[in-house]
């Protein structure tokens, strides 16, 4: 049976960054790997960040998250059927940061997928700089996306103090308890180190972490109502201006509760990936991009967002 791994994590936690490393590790073991990338919204920005994996023999499939639940499940099921017929040994699924993991497990239980796929690992990415307070919907997603994880990886550990890393672990435990989930993570199940320092032994440990069956008390809400996205195409703003102004989106209450900003900008003939959360912004070179910036959050005011970007 094809092993299928799920990499979860709230918006901006660093799923795509880890996925690149994880998929490359499996490919390096001689395993035929395909990544199924599922982004929130109609434009799949994260898929462009994985272009370099193709050079390592990793194939990439995408699903747009900008649709209703039934349509999304149907698209995912169709993709998984197609991939099962192409001889992959391992499929790695990266859902959006507001994904309902129950939806994924429901799809895997459907025929004929239940005869072709076997759940391998569930890996949860949690930001070491996780804010102290989140909305009830965000707290639920944090808990539900982590409940089945065999391993939790803290991201941005190089930027966090020991107290902040411990605070993120406590926050996760609190979110799980609030959802009446019995899942508790022991020290051996949490990896809290700079990802640049992950060793071959660390990756091998993660690659066999498995999963734990758990359940959370369901919080019923429409993710597309609770979380919205604002798209900015062909803004025409220079990289320096965007890097200067994007942080203000997280601190200006009139913009709404901004959770994540991602996109691309061209600077002197080179493309850069912009990736920002409340904890900070990064700009990294990328082979190809497109003039798009996406803001994801709660109660967004697009006009105010653009006003801040153009200052």
Regions found by a protein language model. Name each.
Residues 2-13, 17-135:
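Nucleotide-state-sensitive switch-loop elements of NTP-binding domains
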Residues 37, 126, 276-278, 297:
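Flexible glycine-/small-residue-rich
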Residues 37, 93-95, 156, 234, ...:
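Small/polar loops that bind or transfer phosphate-bearing groups
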Residues 51-52, 114-115, 143-144, 221, ...:
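Short secondary-structure boundary/capping segments
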Residues 83, 98-184:
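Conserved C-terminal guanine-recognition region of P-loop GTPase G domains, centered on the G4
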Residues 92, 228-230, 294:
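Short aromatic/hydrophobic contact patches that present stacked aromatics
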Residues 148-154, 158-289, 300-303, 307-311:
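C-terminal accessory "lid"/substrate-recognition subdomains
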Residues 291-297:
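Short, well-ordered beta-strand elements
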């Amino acid at each position: 049976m094809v092993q299928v791994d799920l990499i979860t994590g709230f918006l901006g936690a660093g799923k795509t960054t880890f996925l690149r490393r994880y998929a490359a590790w499996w490919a390096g073991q001689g395993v035929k790997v395909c990544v199924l990338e599922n982004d929130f919204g109609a434009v799949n920005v994260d898929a462009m960040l994985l272009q370099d994996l193709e050079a390592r023999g990793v194939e990439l499939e995408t699903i747009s998250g900008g649709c209703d639940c039934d349509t999304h499940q149907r698209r995912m099921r169709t993709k998984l059927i197609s991939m099962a017929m192409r001889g992959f040994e391992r499929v790695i699924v990266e859902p959006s940061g507001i994904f309902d993991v129950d939806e994924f497990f429901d799809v895997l239980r459907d025929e004929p997928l239940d005869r072709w796929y076997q759940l391998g690992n569930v890996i949860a990415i949690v930001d070491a700089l996780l804010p102290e307070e989140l909305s009830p919907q965000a707290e639920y997603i944090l808990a539900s996306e982590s409940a089945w994880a065999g391993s939790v990886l803290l991201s941005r550990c190089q930027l966090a103090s020991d107290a902040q890393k411990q605070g993120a672990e406590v926050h996760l435990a609190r979110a799980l308890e609030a959802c009446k989930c019995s899942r508790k993570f022991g020290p051996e199940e949490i990896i809290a180190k700079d990802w640049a320092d992950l060793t071959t032994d660390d990756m091998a440990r993660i690659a066999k972490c498995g999963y734990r069956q758990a359940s959370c008390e369901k919080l019923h809400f429409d993710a597309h109502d609770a979380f919205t996205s604002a798209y900015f195409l062909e803004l025409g703003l220079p990289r320096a201006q965007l890097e200067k102004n994007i942080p203000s989106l997280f601190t200006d209450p009139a913009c709404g509760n901004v959770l994540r900003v991602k996109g691309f900008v061209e600077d002197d003939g080179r493309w850069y990936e912009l990736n920002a959360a409340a904890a900070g912004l990064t700009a990294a070179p990328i082979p190809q991009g497109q003039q798009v910036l996406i803001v994801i959050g709660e109660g967004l005011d697009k006009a105010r967002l653009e006003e801040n970007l153009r200052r």
